[in-house]
């Protein structure tokens, strides 16, 4: 594996373990040349899935788009990269289990919101505001009220 810092091909694996959902192997590596450490993920190659955009266009599914959206929503929040990676794995697993060759962006967005709601409520509201295209303060208030109602319902 090439070191992302110095480009050397001389690296060693320090630790290997499956991700929580078993869909990938997480490897902690160290570069022999520069001594820096980095993480890699090994996944099996999936059958191509097409995403149906709002305007009807189709494009190849890209798990990195989901991950980047979640990272942005979780910015400056107490959510680790590994937690985000596991959430993305769960989303991809759900999509695979459905066996679809095409999926609408709406379905992906709802799965992302479901995972963010479990991870961090502020990140959930941030993502929802962009995903649902909030234009008024009342829309923020409504989603916060919804979260409070759900939380109160759990406490009973």
UniProtKB/Swiss-Prot annotation:
It comes from the Bacteria. GO terms for biological process: negative regulation of DNA-templated transcription. Its cofactor is Zn(2+). Binds 1 zinc ion. One of its GO terms (molecular function) is zinc ion binding. Residues 49-139 form the ATP-cone domain. Pfam families: ATP-cone (PF03477), Zn_ribbon_NrdR (PF22811). Keywords: ATP-binding, DNA-binding, Metal-binding, Nucleotide-binding, Repressor, Transcription, Transcription regulation, Zinc, Zinc-finger. The keyword Repressor applies. Signal peptide: none annotated. A zinc finger (unnamed) spans 3-34. InterPro entries: ATP-cone_dom, NrdR-like_N, RNR_NrdR-like. Negatively regulates transcription of bacterial ribonucleotide reductase nrd genes and operons by binding to NrdR-boxes. Belongs to the NrdR family. This is Transcriptional repressor NrdR. The lineage of its organism: Bacteria, Thermotogati, Thermotogota, Thermotogae, Thermotogales.
């Amino acid at each position: 594996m090439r070191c992302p810092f110095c480009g050397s091909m001389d690296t060693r694996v320090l630790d290997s373990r499956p991700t929580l959902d078993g869909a990938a192997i997480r490897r902690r590596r160290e570069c022999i040349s520069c001594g820096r450490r980095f993480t890699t993920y090994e996944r099996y190659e999936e059958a191509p899935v097409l995403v149906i955009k709002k305007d009807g266009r189709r494009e190849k599914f890209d798990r990195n788009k989901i991950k980047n959206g979640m990272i942005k929503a979780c910015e400056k929040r107490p959510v680790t990269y590994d937690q985000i990676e596991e959430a993305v794995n769960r989303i991809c697993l759900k999509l695979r289990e459905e066996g679809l060759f095409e999926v609408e962006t709406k379905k992906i967005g709802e799965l992302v919101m479901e995972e963010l709601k479990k991870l961090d409520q502020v990140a959930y509201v941030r993502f929802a505001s962009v995903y649902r295209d909030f234009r008024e303060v009342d829309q923020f208030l409504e989603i916060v009220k919804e979260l409070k109602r759900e939380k109160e319902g759990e406490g009973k």
